[in-house]
């Protein structure tokens, strides 16, 4: 990951952005356009996350990305930002996804105090579909077997399911919650074995839920960890409701704590 990319994604290097750059955020549905507006929005996220740490770098043929981790209010929150450059080498598009949903809810409250428009979850009229030109879809890479001690860092759960016997049923339930998926890009993880997949999933109500799934591999080549980030806010909220209906008898209440679930998100 270049220092310039990190600075641009933090809202600190607006000259690295194209004049017509556009940004998709984890919380809002429509894209934000224009260098000044995008740089300001990125700066608001940087401030709300309280100086997040870049923990993982991703690299693909036409897109690169960074995973950021932070603990605003003592709640570990992660976002992944993907950037594409134009022919002049300036950043043309940025897409940001977040996890986990209960802690993104708390982050949304913080952002709303600074810029209410950045926290507006409205999907508009009709099913949500991403803005922009239709991408060139690619094949989903083969996924190795899950390790016995695999951990799932879910986009919707407060806690992390661990172990093949638990993670397997969660992934099976997720597969029942969408009707189709298409792959936008596949990226390598810099410095460690694994890969990331950028996906559009067609979920209940005809909405598109956008995801980044990061698979890290252990020494045996098995999947040791899966990190899943999603956007936009309301589509993920609806997906969470579908998953709760399927898994409420499998996963205990500690997994579901958060807004509009059985228990409120605890105050740190």
Model-predicted segments: where are they?
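C-terminal and inter-domain tail/linker signature
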Residues: 1-268
């Amino acid at each position: 990951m270049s220092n310039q990319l990190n600075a641009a994604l933090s809202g600190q290097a607006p000259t690295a952005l194209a004049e017509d750059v556009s940004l998709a955020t984890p919380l809002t549905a429509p894209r934000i356009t224009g260098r000044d507006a995008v740089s300001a929005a990125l700066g608001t996220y940087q401030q709300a996350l309280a100086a997040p740490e870049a923990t993982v770098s991703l690299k693909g043929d036409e897109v690169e990305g960074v995973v950021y981790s932070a603990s605003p209010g003592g709640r570990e929150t992660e976002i992944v930002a993907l950037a594409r450059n134009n022919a002049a080498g300036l950043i043309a598009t940025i897409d940001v996804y977040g996890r986990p949903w209960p802690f993104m809810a708390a982050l949304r409250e913080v952002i709303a105090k600074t810029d209410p428009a950045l926290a507006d979850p409205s999907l508009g009229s009709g099913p949500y579909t991403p803005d922009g030109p239709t991408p060139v879809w690619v094949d989903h890479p083969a996924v190795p077997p899950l390790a016995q001690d695999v951990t799932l860092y879910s986009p919707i759960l407060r806690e992390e399911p661990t172990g093949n016997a638990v993670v397997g049923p969660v992934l099976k339930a997720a597969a029942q919650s969408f009707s189709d998926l298409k792959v936008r890009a596949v990226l390598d993880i810099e410095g460690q074995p694994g890969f990331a997949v950028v996906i559009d999933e067609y979920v209940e109500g005809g909405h598109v839920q956008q995801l980044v799934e990061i698979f890290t591999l252990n020494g045996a080549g098995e999947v040791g960890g899966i990190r899943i980030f999603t956007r936009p806010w309301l589509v993920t909220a609806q997906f969470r409701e579908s998953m709760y209906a399927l898994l409420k008898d499998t996963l205990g209440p500690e997994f579901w704590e958060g807004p509009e679930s059985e228990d409120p998100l605890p105050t740190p």
